Amino acid sequence: MRPVCPDCTSTHTRKKGIRRGNQRWSCTQCRRQFTTPMDYVEENKFPKILLFDIETSLYHMVGWGTYKQYIQHHQITKHQYIISWAAKWLYDDNVQSDVVTPKESKNRDDKRILKSIWKLLDEADIVIGHNGERFDLRKLRWRFISENMQPPSPFRVIDTLKVARREFFAPSYKQDFLTKYFKLENKLSTEFQLWIDCEAGIPKRLEEMVEYNRHDVMGLEQVYLKLRPYMRNHPNLGVLMDEDVCPTCGENDLTETNNEYFTSANRFPIYRCNNCKTPNIRSKKNSNDKGTEVRSI
């Protein structure tokens, strides 16, 4: 339960820290600041941020040769399915994963592992993937609807591939390049035959596939943390936490710089997070207003 502002009786109040054993609050309507006993303090729930990656099978198609040709939908003889997935919660050492059994792989039956990844996506506030928006999530949604599954609860998406392409002029934007260049967790080497063997249901090869998948997720987390200070429009964690914190990492260790950010109408002091090093701005339209909200530039 959120406290009522003693001046305007609004419940639109925001936590501002602790003072002398009491919780400080700020009213977002009239800007009155007040304190309450610690009984009012709600548990601080850090947003559930999920990093994930999937591995898919091949499509099987028929044609009239190996030359360049357009494959039409009626030439598909076997549809694609999900071989494995891997995921981890941000900062959690535990990497979760699931892979089809040899029998499921031979039958191209991925419904069991679709249910397990669906549960994680349904819990998440934010999901992170490399090419996740264009590939992984669209593939999963197609498999969900193909198996008559309902969509998971809505979440925000951070696509590290889109971030890298938008913010940098690198020689390559593949995760394999980024992890090697920045000396992060490297992807494991694979070959095309691995996918053939997984479809054949060879147990050892299915284990190799999911291990490859798990390494991808560990590398993805490191890529995300490396790129994070440069991410514009990162989902505002302060909104999810209902706290006046760094919108990028959720920490409250902010230092005001001597610089300001200008728009056509206002100017804002720039703060830098001492944890993730991201520069942010705090709402402050003139010198008499006290900064109340931190957001990304």
Regions found by a protein language model. Give the residues of each.
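Short Cys/His-rich "knuckle" micro-motifs
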Residues: 14-19, 37-40, 256-261, 283-286
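Cysteine-rich micro-motifs
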Residues: 20-33, 265-279
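Metal-dependent phosphoesterase core characteristic of DEDDh/y 3'-5' exonuclease domains
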Residues: 47, 80-98, 123-229, 233-237
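Short metal-binding segments enriched for Cys and/or His
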Residues: 31-42, 273-294
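Conserved RNase H-like, two-metal-ion catalytic cores of nucleic-acid enzymes
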Residues: 40-121
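Short, cysteine/histidine-rich loop/knuckle motifs that typically chelate Zn2+
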Residues: 7-10, 29, 247-248, 275
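Cys/His-enriched microdomains
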Residues: 3-6, 25, 244-247, 269-271
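Cys/His-rich microdomains that often coordinate metals
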Residues: 12-13, 34, 252-254, 280
